[in-house]
């Protein structure tokens, strides 16, 4: 799931990840990799399929519908059995989900940054935080970039299966 991975370093990671996985040429491979994105992409081979989600589903008002209805529907439709999720919100599913966590707002809810946000940003991030809190238990494993983030996830959300993989 790369649906909302659209700014800063995440955008570069998304581009590199898509280019790498789209070059898979494993003859006899029995697996298909489905990439959920908001960009139109050409399927270069039979092993990688891009599922384009319209930008409207990233809208603050549609986020709950996206994560509770649209994405679970696609999981069932394409018989997806494992998920690697790079977005800020876990997916509502019982399928094995590895969640790559890199959204500091969720582990610093007391930060002064929240008080300095404009109304739209605060509503948008508060909505995402609400979804994160309510969907975190759908994850089987969370990958964090530092021990501090791992410890905060464990403390704030009582989610214990967090592994640290340092990036950069």
Regions found by a protein language model. Give the residues of each.
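Alpha-helix capping/helix-boundary segments
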Residues: 40-41, 90, 148-150
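Active-site donor-binding segments of glycosyltransferases and PAPS-dependent sulfotransferases
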Residues: 14-20, 24-86
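Acceptor-binding helix/loop patch of EC 2.4 sugar-transfer enzymes
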Residues: 98-126
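A short, glycine/small-residue-rich beta-strand->loop->alpha-helix junction that serves as a flexible
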Residues: 2-16
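Helix-loop-beta element that forms the nucleotide-linked donor phosphate-binding surface
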Residues: 150-168
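Membrane-proximal helix-turn-helix segments that form the acceptor-binding/catalytic region
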Residues: 121-142
